[in-house]
Swiss-Prot record:
Gene Ontology terms: biological process: aminophospholipid transport; mitochondrial genome maintenance; mitochondrial outer membrane translocase complex assembly; mitochondrion-endoplasmic reticulum membrane tethering; protein insertion into mitochondrial outer membrane
Source organism of this protein record: Vanderwaltozyma polyspora (strain ATCC 22028 / DSM 70294 / BCRC 21397 / CBS 2163 / NBRC 10782 / NRRL Y-8283 / UCD 57-17)
Phylogenetic lineage: Eukaryota, Fungi, Dikarya, Ascomycota, Saccharomycotina
Example GO molecular function: lipid binding
Name the record gives this protein: Maintenance of mitochondrial morphology protein 1
Lineage: superkingdom: Eukaryota
Cell compartment(s), UniProt: Endoplasmic reticulum membrane
CDD domains, per database record: SMP_Mmm1
Domain comment quoted from the record: The SMP-LTD domain is a barrel-like domain that can bind various types of glycerophospholipids in its interior and mediate their transfer between two adjacent bilayers.
């Protein structure tokens, strides 16, 4: 191809020189007469230069076949040039110059078009993404009235509420899943089954637990309460103040009541045989824990007062009374569950009117087969005393058990509202630093 380019250049030069000498050679004459010998010379020169073959080798008769091959190739190029001359009568020099100019002009055109397309893309991006109106809504949504302020307020409130609900529902997730993926069309049964599956607890086959660790925690809590009661007599003083404030509400035949004994025990309750099961009549929509509790201790409360005979005049006769009531044994099956306000019905009007019915509650109750043993001591009289009268003991025991059954025995239960588990600033505390532990360098 380089040789053809040189040939084209020579042809153009030949034409120009011919014009300068006012001698015109047609393209047909050049192709038929001059071009074959010229091409043969070019091929032979290239072979001699590339392979270092002497000139005498090309003139020998042994290479007649090679010369014939070269002549055939020259004839091919001659026919090609004839076709070009018949079609356009144009020279190779003008063709190459036009191709070079065309390639340069196509590069400039592509560069300009590329820059222009980039500018158009930037303009569309700035217009539709940067300066777009974010407050525009769909045409199907109702537009607020410009004449009514209340309409504008209600519309903005609805828009904000819809935006906030959609926003929070889209970002709230549980374990990588959205809120709608986990809660839509899923009842309490599915949620409980999911919980049991994730904690590897089978209600039907899981054995009962001993709760030894729980007994240790409860024992530490009770021991702390007892130490505070022993170091400070705040419980006794508080109860005496309470009874004194209620003296005006006491019957007229009772004198002031004073506390003579308060025994908070020295033993601890034992919790055992804990098992999780479905609540009865809940259709497997609620779980509860059954725990057996056993307390073998002495919890005593003693008082003294006087019976007054106010007829025919006040304090005609006075009869001293001393009572001591002690619980020495308590056994029961404790039922504990978590619930909300929608799962139970209040038993009194005061409970029904309470405003704290939202949130979750810890519900507990005792089975009807509970056992509560008492040790009741009574002493009536000043000189001739009546001690431990069975009738008094039975009456006191009956009223205590009645009070307990009406509040804590199934189907009645007690609910304790659970506090919020989210961290709050008002519940934050720091450990108090003792001044004796401060280094001397900081103290100075």
């Amino acid at each position: 191809m380089n040789n053809l380019d040189n040939l084209a250049g020579n042809m153009s030069n030949l034409t120009i020189q011919g014009k300068g000498n006012e001698t015109l050679i047609s393209l047909d004459e050049y192709v038929n007469n001059i071009l074959p010998s010229h091409l043969k010379k070019i091929f032979s020169d290239n072979l001699r230069e590339n392979y270092q073959i002497p000139r005498e080798f090309f003139e020998s008769a042994e290479l007649s076949g090679i010369n014939n091959k070269i002549d055939q190739e020259i004839q091919k190029y001659s026919h090609l040039l004839k076709g070009l001359s018949n079609n356009g009568q144009t020279s190779f020099g003008s063709y190459l110059s036009n191709s070079n100019s065309f390639s340069g002009w196509s590069f400039i055109e592509g560069f300009i078009i590329g820059q222009f397309s980039v500018i158009i893309v930037l303009i569309f991006f700035i217009k539709f993404f940067v300066f777009s109106d974010g407050s525009s809504s769909n045409s199907s949504n109702p537009k607020p009235s410009l004449n009514s302020r209340s309409d504008r307020t209600s519309f903005s409130y609805k828009s904000n509420s819809m935006l906030s609900s959609n926003f929070f529902s889209s970002i709230m997730k549980r374990g990588g899943k959205t809120h709608y993926e986990t809660d839509i069309d899923s009842g309490n049964t599915n949620r409980l089954n999911t919980i049991l599956e994730k904690v590897y607890y089978d209600v039907d086959t899981h054995p009962s637990e001993s709760l030894d660790w729980f007994n240790v925690l409860i024992a530490q809590t009770i021991q702390q309460f007892r130490e505070e009661a022993w170091q400070r007599d705040n419980i006794v003083h508080s109860l005496n103040d309470f009874l004194h404030s209620k003296s005006s509400e006491m019957p007229s035949y009772l004198d002031d009541i004073k506390i003579t004994e308060l025994d908070i025990g020295d033993d601890f309750p034992i919790f055992s045989n804990c098992k999780i099961q479905y609540s009865p009549n809940s259709n497997k929509k609620k779980l509860e824990a059954k725990i057996y509790i056993d307390l073998n201790d002495r919890l005593a409360f003693g008082i003294e007062t006087k019976l007054l005979v106010n007829y025919p005049k006040p304090r005609t006769a006075v009869l001293p009374v001393n009572l001591t009531v002690a619980i020495v044994r308590f056994q029961a099956c404790l039922t504990v569950s978590l619930t909300n306000a929608e799962d139970f019905v209040p038993t009194t009007k005061e409970t029904a009117s309470s405003q704290d019915d939202d949130g979750y509650f810890l519900m507990f109750s005792f089975g009807p087969e509970y056992k509560m043993d008492f040790d009741i001591e009574s002493l009536i009289g000043a000189r001739s005393k009546l001690q431990n009268i069975p009738k008094i003991s039975s009456v006191i025991e009956y009223h205590i058990k009645k009070w307990f059954v009406e509040r804590c025995v199934e189907p009645r239960f007690q609910c304790i509202r659970l506090p919020s588990m989210w961290p709050r600033s008002k519940n934050t505390r720091e450990e108090k630093v003792d001044t004796d532990d401060v280094p001397l360098s900081k103290a100075e």
